[in-house]
Amino acid sequence: MTTQNLMCPVCRQRLELVSKTWRCEQGHSYDIAKQGYVNLHVVQHKHSKNPGDTPESVDARRAFLQGGYYQPLQQAVVHLLKDLKAKMVLDIGCGEGYYTSAMQQVVEQCIGVDIAKNAVQRAAKLNDKVTWVVGTGATLPVIDQSMDVCTSLFSPIPQTEILRVLNDDGYLIVVTPATDHLYAKREALFEQVNPHTPQKFVEQLQDLFELKEQQVIDAPLVLDQQALKNLIAMTPYAYKASPERRMQLEQKAHLQVTASFQIYLFQKRNKKAI
């Protein structure tokens, strides 16, 4: 029997791994799928049959990230976790696991959760040392005060749930597009380009979390045609741009563009200090 920090989504008790099934004391059970993940997204929490990213966008993102274009961001997050000496980490919105798999190598236990089953299925093939979970931010699948760090990279930030699962001195790492992220690509797709507004997250989180550090990672990229197509397909831009502008951009042999990432490190505020 293996004990970790997973929580039953029905009764909220700790799950124990017996053979290849996660079970709680109330008798609820969740089998590990043949791909190596567990589905803790119970029916009553679902709003659609296949929530999350489409298989097409998941495949495009996996192909793009495997090209190493966002490796500077991946390594920056890993270094941050090492500096924090984190042991228990929950990656919220893990997708196909590119960042989560790297995180696992510097912590004791790493849990990756995503609402998109097709993404988690792909992630589970990447690294069997990560505990991969299909679940939702509305009910994070871990027990109270069990995590040293939660991470949200380009993903939702369920504040109340993050507060619940972090220990008293726990940290939250948020990664979001910096002001001019992929400006050249957006300029080609849209007549008007609005700058990203990463500062809004600091304002949204300030009551519950204290900002400890922030940094911007810039990664100048030269994309060939296939990488460019993958980059467009893996983001919401694919659906918001006009078909004509998208086609025109996808026909380019190369595109020079700078990826710019805003990294925020927050710490859970001490209730006694508020």
Give each language-model segment a name:
Residues A116-N118:
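Conserved SAM/SAH-binding beta-strand->alpha-helix loop
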Residues D169-H181:
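Conserved beta-strand signature within the Rossmann-like core of class I S-adenosyl-L-methionine
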Residues T3-Q4, V216-I274:
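Conserved Class I S-adenosyl-L-methionine
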